[in-house]
């Protein structure tokens, strides 16, 4: 089975995530089809922003409104693998508003966040460019944790090797 990677190009630099297609197949399929545009007719994440950044916690993106309230127009069920825990930095996980409300929003941890286990589906981890993720997390932000200077996702390319 080929390994799947997501290559993030942002206004702050590039980073790469390995996607866990073997442990979270539905979640990875959703992310990949949004990223490459097969679900929406155009690459969904291109041009969106990281709308929430919290040092020592996470960075969050994937909202088409840039507010944290938007999504792709559908929701799907949680997918938890018993071996995946929020026990390290650099994990790629689905943001949601409760059980089975996953859509397009995701976050990347910059701390151990074990209280999120079995609440947010982990579907990958950063394998290159974690310093860029950390830089985004440490961006100056307003009282709503929104970066004062917009941090844009220029593109998310999917690579299979």
Question: Which role fits each region the language model picked out?
Answer:
Residues 1-161:
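Cyclophilin-like peptidyl-prolyl cis-trans isomerases
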